[in-house]
Amino acid sequence: MLPLFVAVSMKKEKDPFFERFLAKCSAIGYIKNQEEERTIALKKILLLATGGTIASTPGEEGLEPSLQSDGLAHMIGGITANYEVDFKDILNLDSSNIQPEEWQLIAGQIGQMHSGYDGIVVTHGTDTMAYTASILSFMLHNIPIPIVLTGSQLPILHPLTDGVENLRCAFAMAASGAPGVFVAFNRKVILGARAVKVRTTGFDAFESVNAPYAAIVDSTGLRLNKEVLPVLTGPFRPEQGLCSNVVLVKLTPGLNPEIFDMLLHMNYK
């Protein structure tokens, strides 16, 4: 957890009561001299924009992802002032159109650029965010920095958007040093392979399946659950090979078993 700093200009005329107050506050970490505060290095974060509701504006057929990363940067200046942030556009899609080719592109960009950053935030549409987070967890196994996906239920330009708070949480997680892939949403952080979207309109859109939250935001700040966080088990070697011939079949009473023969003839693995 990052300490709370209050910058104080030292008075030229010493007041004994004021001096005792400063000494006590310094002892518990609440006050830092302004010169000392300026020496604290900002975490370097990369934001990769892929589109989604968070980057959408009204169009002829409803919301359309059209806002570029520089537009996002303008809207969240109060957040990025606390970090050294670079922005890059790699996609501008409604996430319902995300395909395995896009997963390979996102993973490839992260694999190429991760060594220059303390963490990476990926803005993404909510419809398929859980799918992307899950596949990236395997494609980026043992990545040594936090990769945090986030988005919003309302566009960043909407006056009641949840996007700003979600990005605030995502940046905090990206700066935490915890390795792995995560989803940050509604002040909760979920392991990438455990996230599922359970609500289409509510801000509390994602839940964690069969695992506690990796972190939450409360009155103490970002609180990590160290028992849940991934542990590096070897060197990072990004995986680019994907098999798209995969289908999910939900078994129900009366299901015709010949469907499996049909799938085999269609080259599903």
Question: Can you say where each PLM-predicted feature lies in the sequence?
Answer:
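Accessory alpha-helical/coil subdomains and C-terminal extensions
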Residues: 43, 48-49, 75-79, 191-269
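Short, positively charged and aromatic/hydrophobic N-terminal segments
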Residues: 17, 23-32, 36-38
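Short Gly/Thr/Asp-enriched flexible loops that form oxyanion-binding sites at enzyme active sites
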Residues: 125-145
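Internal gly/pro-rich beta-alpha loop/helix module
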Residues: 149-219
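ATP/NTP phosphate-donor binding region
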Residues: 40-112
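Buried hydrophobic positions in well-ordered alpha/beta secondary-structure cores of metabolic enzymes
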Residues: 51-52, 121, 170, 187
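Short acidic, glycine-rich surface-loop motifs adjacent to enzyme active sites
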Residues: 117-129, 266-269
